[in-house]
């Protein structure tokens, strides 16, 4: 597959992943599917906006760049037929790095939150974090330590797990584009388009 075509495929995959990440992060503001009375009762990691910023906003820009690569004109520099395409592929590599860092941020925030557990109203009538070092992951009986919001443990665990998986997939896809972009920069795309007037190799 041409490097431009590969990038377009990656971009088309990143867009829905970014949308799902944003939606998952938004749902975290409604623990157990309910509106909280006090925002301070939400887990700290929810406010880090891992899904909205990391896997969402910072992923949209690279995805759009990747999608536009296949149609990019390859006649851009002083009459050199491959220069424009190579520069576009190099630029996509930089955007892929940005996307990778955003996905990594979301991945780390999600992993920390899963290990830490949700903030909830505990049996001692205070709000806090009753779990330690992910102990609740292997012992569902510990979930009873959280009295309110109802079902906050499975809610947070499910949504942060989704963000963890999405972040991991996005990191892999962006890493692939870094390699793909470098190959496109060094070797050129498999064909020349636009003002170059034909399907000549570069």
UniProtKB/Swiss-Prot annotation:
Protein name, per record: Transmembrane 4 L6 family member 4
InterPro entries xref list? L6_membrane (IPR008661)
Q: Which of UniProt's keywords are assigned here? A: Glycoprotein, Membrane, Transmembrane, Transmembrane helix
Q: Which residues cross the membrane?
A: 10-30, 49-69, 94-114, 159-179
Native source species:
Rattus norvegicus (Rat)
Q: What top-level branch of life does the organism fall under? A: Eukaryota
Sugar attachment sites are: 156
The family classification in the record reads:
Belongs to the L6 tetraspanin family.
Q: What does this protein do?
A: Regulates the adhesive and proliferative status of intestinal epithelial cells. Can mediate density-dependent cell proliferation.
